[in-house]
Swiss-Prot record:
Protein name: Aspartate--tRNA ligase
Molecular function terms from GO: aspartate-tRNA ligase activity; ATP binding; nucleic acid binding
Binding site for ATP: 220-222, 229, 479, 531-534
Gene behind this protein: aspS
Residues at which L-aspartate binds: 220, 445, 486
Family assignment from sequence similarity: Belongs to the class-II aminoacyl-tRNA synthetase family. Type 1 subfamily.
GO cellular component annotations of the record: cytoplasm
């Protein structure tokens, strides 16, 4: 070993011993006859001291040529610091240097490698190996490792078996686009990278493995949005002979265990609400329940009026913003513009200020008298000083628009703390949704999700009303995990394929291996997958998943460090039998 200790472990009890440290130069303070060097590794920082008449002249001379981020080895004695630094774990001691070796030089970094840096995100991604030297990112990667460690411990304690599934698989329809990989050996044929190990984990249940898990890489060729990664990691799980209630119980306890083991936070029992309730109360299937401001329906109260924006609306609903009756015209205009940009409702944003003296200020006052507005306020649990914001339109569009407005106000008014965690289960999702572009039903989750037993007969008459045996785990408005009870009966699976518009031949070609497997004794089974990157970000109290991924892509899906994606050589193109269109 080139060192005897790390830069984070020496304390007062080590005074008098000779040690050798290795690391990067964080900072140098040169007073001429006295030089201090802060030496850093991933364990911490230790101060080195070099002093005229004590340190050898050749070492003092050598120090004049050392810069930030040089890699050095220093040997010396541990001594007590005269001016202690209580903010550093090693702040009571320093190393009186006896010998020093430069292990490698370093160019001046393009940004500060410190707790707080001056580098922009794109620059730091270009030099990710330098950004990863910074303590916050190293702390995030260590947290990620800790979450994985505890996840494995819990699952293996509960008899789950870790099984690796293939990364080169068959491309199947549905969901996001696949990343495809051309086969050189089989010209004009392609593999796909898995969007999830879904089919393989179901086949493992058919194989009798009973309980499976995997921390799995997944790939989705989606249009890029902020904080989406084309490759991401799932904690993927599947179980045989279970009900939905069993899975919710096991993985609620799993989540509680992870939070307590990693950050010593004890979570209360998770509430469970239906998809319909989530949309009705929060305007989203991923509700943040850390704060109130629930959606309140006003349709029956206001529909019999001459106010044109309300006359044709299927839903009229609003939110009560506590203590914001003093919002300015500009603030209200900004909210109106925000709603307009969502392009969900044709009506504008209607506001009602419930003033401190009990009167109302609203552009709808000419259509509704004080008595009617008082009923609105009562329905919305408003008191003087509150602001009512109301939208009207189609049911789902109005709910979604109000849900988005609710979250915008959450952020503007700083209504929540990242230190508070509010998990809940959302269940009873629609099994199918109608796609206008393709003029067919598509699976809301995937085509292997089981419908609720009592809704199966509706598949042939009202497919859009069928509910799924599906569930999502949501924490602080983020979907952390999702899963379902799967179909294990061939006839029902083929019926679902038919409702989705697959011909018998298409279904056979794409999924025949799965339906064949169901004929050999497939057990009832279900599962769940956690977004591992998102789980780490929530636990780490960050909004973005990027700080918890060692080498992430940017918002355009590019690796700006390796310059990927990139072109390939003509020889590679020729070997793959690919013709590129211009």
């Amino acid at each position: 070993m080139l060192r005897t200790h790390t830069c984070g472990e020496l304390r007062l009890q080590h005074i008098g011993i000779s040690v050798t440290l290795c690391g990067w130069v964080q900072k140098i303070r040169n007073k001429g006859s006295l030089v201090w060097i802060d030496l850093r590794d991933r364990y911490g920082i230790t101060q080195l001291i070099l002093e005229e008449h004590i340190t050898a002249p050749e070492i003092l001379s050598q120090v004049q040529h050392i810069g930030r981020e040089y890699v050095i080895q220093a040997t010396g004695s541990v001594i007590e610091r005269s001016a202690k630094n209580p903010s550093m774990p090693t702040g009571d001691i320093e190393i009186e240097v006896k010998s020093l070796t430069i292990l490698n030089t370093a160019k001046t970094p393009p940004f500060l490698i410190e707790e707080q840096t001056d580098g922009g995100e794109e620059l730091r991604m270009q030099y990710r190996y330098l950004d990863l030297r910074r303590p916050p990112l190293q702390k995030n990667l260590l947290l990620r490792q800790l979450v994985a460690q505890h996840a494995r411990a819990y699952l293996e304690q509960h008899h789950f078996v870790d099984v690796e599934t293939p990364l080169l698989i068959k491309s199947t329809p549905g969901g996001a686009r696949d990343f495809v990989v051309p086969s050189r050996i089989h010209p004009q044929q392609f593999y796909a990278l898995p969007q999830s190990p879904q089919i393989f984990k179901q086949l493992l249940m058919v194989a009798g493995l009973d309980r499976y898990y995997q921390i799995a890489k997944c790939f989705r060729d989606e249009d890029f949005r902020a904080d989406r990664q084309p490759e991401f990691t799932q904690i993927d799980c599947e179980l045989s002979f279970v009900t939905q209630a069993d899975i919710l119980h096991i993985f609620e306890n799993f989540t509680k265990y992870i939070f307590e083991a990693t950050i010593q936070v004890r979570l209360d029992k998770f509430p469970c609400i239906t998809y319909a309730e989530a949309m009705q109360k929060y305007g989203t299937d991923k509700p943040d329940i850390r704060f109130g401001m629930r959606l309140i329906e006003l349709t029956e109260l206001v529909k019999n009026s001459e106010f044109p924006l309300f006359k044709q609306a299927k839903l009229i609903a609003g939110i009560c913003v506590k203590g914001c009756a003093d919002y300015t015209r500009k603030q209200l205009d900004d909210l109106t513009e925000y709603i307009k940009k969502l392009n969900l409702v044709t009506s504008g944003l209607v506001y009602v200020k419930y003033l401190a003296d009990g009167s109302f200020n609203s552009p709808v006052s000419k259509f509704y008298d004080v008595e009617q507005l008082t009923l609105w306020a009562k329905q919305m649990h408003a008191v003087p000083g509150d602001l009512l914001l109301i939208l009207a339109g189609e049911i789902e569009a109005t709910q979604i628009a109000l849900g988005s407005l609710r979250l915008k106000l959450r952020d503007e008014l700083h209504l929540v703390s990242k230190d508070k965690f509010a998990p809940l289960w959302v269940v009873d999702f629609p099994l199918l949704e109608w796609n206008e572009e393709s003029q067919r039903y598509v699976s809301r989750h995937h085509p292997f999700t089981s419908p609720k037993q009592e809704d199966i007969e509706l598949l042939s008459t009202k497919p859009e009303t069928v509910r799924a045996n599906a569930y999502d785990l949501v924490i602080n408005g983020m979907e952390i995990g999702g899963g379902s009870i799967r179909i294990h009966d061939r006839a029902l699976q083929e019926q679902i394929f038919n409702v989705l518009g697959f011909s018998e031949e298409e279904a056979r070609q794409q999924f025949g291996f799965l339906t064949d497997a169901f004929e050999y004794g497939a057990p009832p089974h279900g599962g769940i997958a956690f977004g591992f990157d998102r789980l780490c970000a929530i636990i780490g109290r960050e909004d973005s998943i990027r700080p918890f991924i060692a080498f992430p892509k940017n918002n355009a899906g590019r690796d700006v460090m390796m310059k990927a994606p990139s072109t390939i050589t003509e020889q590679q193109i020729s070997e793959l039998g690919i013709i590129l269109s211009k």
